[in-house]
A protein has these predicted regions:
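Noncatalytic carbohydrate-binding groove/subsite architecture in carbohydrate-active enzymes
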Residues: 152, 156, 191-314, 349
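Short, acidic/polar
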Residues: 68-82, 154-163, 229-241, 316-323
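Boundary/entry segment of secreted carbohydrate-active catalytic domains
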Residues: 46-87, 92-94
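Hydrophobic alpha-helical membrane-insertion segments, chiefly the h-region
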Residues: 37-47
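Hydrophobic faces of well-ordered beta-strands that scaffold small-molecule active sites
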Residues: 57-63, 89-91, 125-129, 172-176, ...
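Aromatic-rich peripheral "rim/lid" segments of glycoside hydrolase catalytic domains that contact
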Residues: 107, 180, 307-321, 325, ...
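Substrate-binding cleft and catalytic face of glycoside hydrolase catalytic domains
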Residues: 84-225, 258, 291, 343-346
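N-terminal Sec-pathway targeting helices
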Residues: 21-36
Length: 390
């Protein structure tokens, strides 16, 4: 998650010229159908059943709280997710949670259970390999919210343990860390060179344990260059400069755009920075020889309340627009909504309010919006292609 959207860069991010922007606009048939629907009063459900796109691999939910719930609740929530078209769940394989007691001790039970629950519902799993126990943390970070590994080799050993344990059971997708360009996830502050060293070591170890695995670089947040956090585009370019090419199969990205909608160009918007600004995530990938690789949106959403809240209607609109937009972009491999259920009701905590459901389990308008979009895809059986780790 990110705290604000005003993501600056070391140099100005310029808007791509109109002829290039045309490549990102919705297909004419979608626009025509939407206009017709508004004029005729036809529901959006009908409109979007007419548009089918087969190349997007996966729609999922990023749900860090699912692992904390009972097996019964997990089964119930996963069934509800699947009923609205969700086919995958993104979960933390938290090193600090599994090996908190030392390098020879493993507390696998909670992670084992949630992976079992997902597979029992026929859902694929994206495991985020992250976290760091105090005994393996870099000096001075062990007491931080997100301590960072002291040794890439030790982190790689952890990554190999995760891959060796879960790949034989069907997990094929591993994401290396979460938002490493944010101080909230990388202490004492983001360090592209240190992250890249961990990524390279983890990639090699995962591929030895599971050669067919899809390894995604840690989802980058559209932060500002404020002396602490690093803008996602700049961070990605620094990763390439530090030798990251060849050590990931896809780029992880979190294109949050609120309070704007995804299709509204804003130079600070994570969605716009994906490929509309100059430079952008895609332009950096292309200039470094990785145009053939995909971007995986491993988080996207908007808070319905709290200090950065956009309201329930705008939250629903943002998710609808993100899903529809992603289906029109060939280089997006998958999209994960953040998140299933509000984590609380704190008026001062924006993170509490991203759910499709309230903290009490009542569906918000965003639930219906996602259900409509993904239900349409499900009925065509074309929008969600292979489940790589089923």
């Amino acid at each position: 998650m990110i705290t604000f959207r005003s993501a600056g860069t070391r140099g100005p991010i310029a808007r791509v010229p109109d002829d290039a922007m045309a490549k990102r606009r919705w297909p004419a048939e979608i626009i025509a159908l939407l206009v017709a629907a508004l004029l005729l009063g036809v529901g959006l459900t009908y409109v979007m059943t007419q548009y089918q796109r087969p190349s997007l691999d996966r729609f999922g939910i990023s749900d860090p709280e699912l692992i904390t719930k009972s097996a019964k609740v997990q089964a119930s929530e996963l069934a509800a997710m699947k009923a609205i078209g969700i086919t995958s769940v993104r979960l933390d394989a938290d090193w600090g949670g599994v090996q908190y007691a030392g390098p020879k001790t493993f507390a696998w039970a909670p992670l084992d259970q949630v992976v079992r629950s997902a597979h029992a519902k026929g859902m694929s799993v994206d495991l985020i390999i992250d976290g760091c126990p105090g005994w393996a943390a870099k000096a001075g970070t062990s007491g931080d919210v997100s301590p960072t590994p002291a040794s890439p080799a030790q982190f790689a050993t952890w990554a190999a343990e995760v891959a060796a344990r879960y790949a034989p059971g069907g997990v094929r997708m591993f994401e290396i860390w979460n938002e490493p360009n944010r101080v909230g996830f990388w202490s004492p502050k983001p360090d592209p060179a240190a992250y890249t060293a961990d990524l390279k070591a983890a990639y090699a170890s995962i591929k030895r344990a599971a050669p067919s695995a899809l390894v995604i670089s840690g989802g980058l947040a559209p932060e500002a260059n404020d002396g602490t956090n690093i803008n996602a585009v700049d961070f990605l370019q620094a990763m390439y400069a530090d030798g990251a090419q060849g050590s990931f199969d896809a780029v992880g990205y979190h294109p949050y755009s609120y309070p704007a909608l995804p299709d509204s160009y804003q130079s600070w918007s994570g969605w716009s920075q994906m490929d509309q600004t100059r430079p952008s995530i895609r332009s950096v990938m292309t200039s470094n020889g990785d145009a053939a690789k995909q971007v995986w949106i491993t988080e996207v959403g908007a808070p319905s309340s709290g200090p950065d809240g956009v309201g329930r209607a705008a939250q629903a609109a943002a998710l609808s627009e993100a899903i529809v937009g992603a289906r029109t972009i060939s280089w997006i491999g998958g999209l994960y909504v953040y998140t299933w259920q509000d984590e609380g009701t704190g008026p001062s905590n924006y993170v509490d309010w991203f759910g499709l459901l309230t903290a009490r389990g009542t569906p918000k308008p965003a639930y219906a919006a996602v259900a409509a979009a993904l239900g349409r895809c499900g009925r065509t059986h074309r929008c969600i292609s292979r489940a790589a780790d089923r």
